[in-house]
Amino acid sequence: MYIYRKPYEQNYWNNFILLSLYVNNKRVGVNKNITKLEYILLDIFLHGPLHTEFINYLEITNYINNRTYLYEKMLKEKSVNAINIILPPVMHTASFEYNYEIIEDLDSNKILNIYILNNKCYYCRKLKDDSYWEKFPFNEIPIFVNDKKVGLRLKTDKLKTTKNLTKVEYYLLDIFWFGPLKIEASEHYEKIMRQIKDRNKKYMCLYYEKIINGINIIFNISNNIEYKKFLNNDYSIKEMINVEHILTIYVLT
C-alpha cells in the first residue's frame, strides 16, 4: 500500500521570496530559469517522496520534515545568509525518491551549500510465490497463461483446464503483470511502470465493458537469450480477440 501526494504548484514556490533559498545557484521564487524538474526535485527534498510505502511513511516524512524545519529555522534566525541546494547534472525523480546522500558546506559568506549525491539506485521487489497466484480469485478479470487458468475463479466456461502453471509460467506472469524484479531507478523505470499500469488498466476496462471475457497470456520463451530480453522488458506483444471473446496476448522477444 502506498501513500501518494501531488507536487506543490508554482504559487507555493513564489512565496519563498521571503527566504533566501536557492537551487543550483538560482533563487527560488525569483529566478524564472528554474526548470520544472528542478522544482519537483526541490519539492521531494524538502517535503518527501511523491509516493511512499505506508509502512515507511511516518519514518521518512518525520525525518524530512525535521530536516526542512531546521533549514527554515537557520534562515529565519540568520544563522546562515542563504541555503543553496546543488543537484547533480543527471537526476531523475525515481532515483531521488529515497536513495541519495547530502554533503553540507558553509562557505565564507555564510551560505550553506547542500550537495546532493545521486547514488545509483535500484528498485527491487519480491517475486510472488505460487500460493499467491493459486489463492488469488481474480474477481476483476479472468487470467490464463498458455491456456491454463490462474487463480480460484469458480465460474467460467472459457478455456476450462485442469492443468497447473509451471514455476516458470508463474515467474513470467509475475513480471508481465507487476514489472521487473530489479531495475535501475530512472526515467526509463518510470516509463516502463507507467506502460504496464496503463496496459493492465486497458485490459480491466475491456473486461468491465464486456468486450472481452478474460485474457490469455501466451509465452513462447525457450532459451536464455529470450529470457534475458524479457527480464529487461525488451519484448513486444501481439493481441487478438478470439471467437470466445478471450483476448489472447502473445509475448514476443
From Swiss-Prot:
InterPro entries: DUF613 (IPR006851). GO terms for cellular component: plastid. Its main location: plastid. Keywords: Plastid. It holds the Pfam family DUF613. It is found in: Plastid. It comes from the Eukaryota. Belongs to the A.longa ORF167/ORF288 family. This is Uncharacterized 30.8 kDa protein in rpl12-rps7 intergenic region. It comes from Euglena longa (Euglenophycean alga).
